[in-house]
Amino acid sequence: MGDSNVDTGTTTSEMVAEEVSLFSATDMVLFSLIVGLLTYWFIFRKKKDEVPEFSKIETTTSSVKDSSFVEKMKKTGRNIIVFYGSQTGTAEEFANRLSKDAHRYGMRGMAADPEEYDLSDLSSLPEIENALAVFCMATYGEGDPTDNAQDFYDWLQEADVDLTGVKYAVFGLGNKTYEHFNAMGKYVDKRLEQLGAQRIFDLGLGDDDGNLEEDFITWREQFWPAVCEHFGVEATGEESSIRQYELVVHTDMDTAVVYTGEMGRLKSYENQKPPFDAKNPFLAVVTTNRKLNQGTERHLMHLELDISDSKIRYESGDHVAVYPANDSALVNQLGEILGTDLDIVMSLNNLDEESNKRHPFPCPTTYRTALTYYLDITNPPRTNVLYELAQYASEPSEQEQLRKMASSSGEGKELYLSWVVEARRHILAILQDYPSLRPPIDHLCERLPRLQARYYSIASSSKVHPNSVHICAVVVEYETKSGRVNKGVATSWLRAKEPAGENGRRALVPMFVRKSQFRLPFKATTPVIMVGPGTGVAPFIGFIQERAWLQEQGKEVGETLLYYGCRRSDEDYLYREELAQFHAKGALTRLSVAFSREQPQKVYVQHLLKRDKEHLWKLIHDGGAHIYICGDARNMARDVQNTFCDIVAEQGPMEHAQAVDYVKKLMTKGRYSLDVWS
């Protein structure tokens, strides 16, 4: 939209003269009447209709929050509460482990989802003797809170409450490859102190780019001694395996009440009702699934999901989340090795009747369904899982090894890192390599983490494709150090989703859309600089589609530059024809492609950015251009950011420190946006 201020050439004195001549007595009466009516309307008007705000990330909350977690703690005799902000389940898992630890010190703990409680109740926590609030807070995206911690974050920002007497500790979960490392954990720790709460142990900062599990164990083994010293308590014994859930086998149950993979409401896949979100995904039909690349070494694919009649709305730059299923071959092998009938209908019921979490996953269900849709069986299990399963190893040496890997000793940590993490051993591989380890399948299901949704940058614009969401992904497959071939859960599952389906059946994908801040500028005339090697090009396909659509509507569109990178032009140049067409029509002003393996010396996107430094600086400094980076966070995003800093320093010209500050200010102003992963 252009500016609405128009210079008519009328002077101030002329305007005053006109006003004097125009305002007669009649005009004044009418003017007074209008003012009176407006005043009446503002005072007595009804509440205006609510306007949906699409820029805010929508979250799924409980319909009624518990009135007081403090009252619940009093009622159940607990004095430690561990809140978790979790997007992938890891922070929730850590919170459960900490709450379970409490019994060793004569204390009782509970893990809690902040979305289910009123956190203003924190001020009442000192009413409980030796009370402690622990916060396991993950940072999502570019310094954002997780969905379930959004309300808590908003409350902290606005809170004007005295938390004197509240004792707390924070462990943050983040990734150092991201610009805002552990922003949420750091903010919660600092803000609670500002509100008067007392920190009883140092902030822990876990790094998922390194070894998050080891970071947590190291913090945890120092945290509990600090708790003991502060409250004057002592450990009552060694860590023990205490079951949280009891197994109930259903021998004669109506199949109509058995979960078959639904994430929330029973039979929700048979009777779909909006709104659709993480707890109520939409079953989208796969209408297109085509290979994008020519090479045989990797499989890069483009999928289109039909969202007609779902009322799902998305914008360019949003993410689509899909719930995958584990490979049936792995599930069958687990059943075989444990000698279990996977089709037994069962429930795992929480032994703590006061807990808000009645089951670890939707129950009643079958072991087959749980291992296929609800449990993560492909990632290396964490140390607490190894510790609890060790008791079922009949061979002493195997039991000793498992307990050692679960210990906090240097030797144990090193063994766990090399034998489990670096070798990418999942639970089936561990059972295969330790023949005497045969845990009951119900205990295994209790300890395994939940299978999480996978997020992809949407590769389409809703202006052009309002009834479909497009995905661009590369199938993950690699050989481990132990010689096994591991496959990506979601990408392998998506690859098999043929549009026609088997026997004419439709291929369905449970999905929902997560709003993002990765947005095109409000003004279409603003130049955009997009950098996206590999599948990082995905959101930019949507951006370019939208700008092409705006041009077709007769709108003026600013320069649109894409810096794309791949290995070879004849191997993995994604969307080659589409990009060429956009470039030919002028929707894509400049298309610069770096081929890393097509010549003796490797060429990456940052080399092309340096080549165009003068033009880029003009667009950024004079044209107010917005910069977008999508792809690998560990190397590419960092190198590209350094390249922009070099360009700013050289073209400014200015000192390097000033250039770094210049780029960071672009980020603060929303002119340098990242959609990256590690």
From Swiss-Prot:
Cofactor(s) recorded in Swiss-Prot or TrEMBL: FAD; FMN
Domain Flavodoxin-like: 80-224
Enzyme class: oxidoreductase
Disulfide bridge map: none
Domain FAD-binding FR-type as annotated: residue spans: 279-521
Transmembrane segments: 23-43
EC number, UniProt record: 1.6.2.4
Residues involved in FAD binding: 424, 454-457, 472-474, 478, 488-491, 677
Protein name from the UniProt record: NADPH--cytochrome P450 reductase
